[in-house]
């Protein structure tokens, strides 16, 4: 499979090139980007760089190459505008030498208006820019994705309270397809490492960057494994490795697929989310006219809002049933391949990243996530 590099590296490459131009260093058609806490550098191609506004600003441009055909950021055009600001006389040792600003097409958090950028992305920027900033100055770095607003409409960003563009996420330098067998093998290798030495028998499986970031913020006492879309085979692998408890932690829009017996959750392979919700609504004896409305909705968040407007108690009961169904269907799935009494727990969060529901087993651990 063709390898690529995550969005933070391409942003850092464009930013480093712009800053070098601003301080008078020569242009190169690539930048060697250092990876935090790793002894390696990655060559990032730079498209162009130039000075703006009477040479007080510099623009660096790169095009992301994630190596993933279906990835939304493949060939994404990235602009970074660098400018320098003198340290304040009253505060010569400012604690934030780099001010990262969300320009057009870059996602911000709806509730705080802060730029949506991962800790890894910030670390990559700091690692590769601090050594070029002249003494006595701070760097103002505006990041722009010219096509970001349009592309964001094809993501679930709004479901997580991210608006106005694409978020700058990523927790590692290299990328791989979430539907690729390579990802499954890497996740199985990581699971094998987790269950060694002082492993206590319980592990948290998360899907996607939002789930991973939220789980890390919970300061869990359990190890966390990002499983991508190969969740079914990895639950089976956990049973083979004699794991005692797997806690499935994720957004309802992904985990609902398990309730319908879909154990590879990539949307390009199978969807069925609304259909599964309609089935659960029938079980809860939701009126026919509401079920018809549900069947025509585009996503699960719209369905949840419709159900809550109709009857909050029924909506809550339905999603609790969803949590229990996820646990039961997952246990049945695993036992097709390996006989096990491994406990499978489900804990689900909503678009506001609030932990809302848990199954029978998930309730035993939900306090650890709050």
Swiss-Prot record:
GO terms for biological process: anaerobic cobalamin biosynthetic process; methylation. It is an enzyme of class 2 (transferase). Pathway: Cofactor biosynthesis; adenosylcobalamin biosynthesis; cob(II)yrinate a,c-diamide from sirohydrochlorin (anaerobic route): step 6/10. GO terms for molecular function: cobalt-precorrin-5B C1-methyltransferase activity. Coiled coil: none annotated. SUPFAM superfamilies: CbiD-like. Its EC number is 2.1.1.195. The keyword Signal does not apply. InterPro entries: CbiD, CbiD_sf. It holds the Pfam family CbiD. Keywords: Cobalamin biosynthesis, Methyltransferase, S-adenosyl-L-methionine, Transferase. Belongs to the CbiD family. This is Cobalt-precorrin-5B C(1)-methyltransferase. The lineage of its organism: Bacteria, Bacillati, Cyanobacteriota, Cyanophyceae, Synechococcales. The gene is cbiD.
């Amino acid at each position: 499979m063709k390898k690529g590099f995550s969005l933070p590296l391409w942003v850092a490459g464009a930013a480093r090139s712009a800053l070098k131009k601003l301080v008078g260093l020569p242009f190169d058609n690539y930048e060697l980007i250092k990876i935090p806490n790793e002894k390696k550098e990655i060559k990032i191609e730079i498209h162009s760089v130039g000075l703006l506004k009477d040479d007080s600003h510099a623009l660096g441009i790169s095009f992301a190459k994630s190596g993933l055909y279906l990835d939304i950021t493949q060939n994404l055009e990235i602009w970074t505008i660098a400018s320098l600001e003198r340290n304040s006389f009253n505060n010569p040792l400012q604690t934030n030498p780099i001010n990262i600003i969300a320009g057009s097409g870059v996602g911000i958090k709806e509730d705080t208006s802060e730029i949506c950028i991962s800790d890894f992305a910030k670390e990559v920027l700091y690692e590769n820019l601090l050594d070029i900033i002249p003494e006595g100055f701070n760097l103002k770095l505006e990041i722009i994705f010219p096509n970001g607003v349009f592309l964001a409409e094809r993501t679930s960003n709004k479901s997580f309270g991210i608006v106005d563009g694409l978020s700058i996420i990523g927790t590692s330098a290299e990328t791989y397809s979430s539907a690729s067998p390579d990802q499954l093998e890497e996740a199985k290798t990581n699971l094998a490492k987790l269950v060694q030495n002082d492993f206590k028998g319980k592990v948290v499986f998360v899907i996607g960057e939002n789930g991973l970031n939220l789980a890390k913020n919970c300061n869990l006492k359990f190890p966390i494994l990002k499983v991508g879309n190969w969740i079914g085979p990895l639950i089976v692998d956990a049973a083979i490795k004699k794991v005692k408890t797997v806690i499935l932690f994720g957004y309802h829009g992904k985990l609902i697929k398990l309730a319908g017996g879909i154990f590879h959750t990539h949307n390009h392979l199978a969807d069925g989310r609304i259909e599964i919700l309609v089935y659960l609504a029938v079980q809860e004896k939701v009126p026919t006219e509401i079920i018809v409305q549900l069947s025509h909705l585009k996503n699960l968040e719209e369905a949840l809002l419709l159900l809550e407007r109709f009857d909050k108690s029924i909506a809550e009961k339905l999603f609790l049933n969803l949590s229990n169904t996820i646990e039961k269907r997952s246990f049945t799935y695993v036992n097709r391949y390996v006989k096990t009494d491994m406990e499978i727990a489900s804990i689900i969060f909503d678009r506001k990243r609030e932990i809302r529901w848990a199954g029978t087993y998930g309730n035993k651990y939900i306090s650890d996530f709050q």
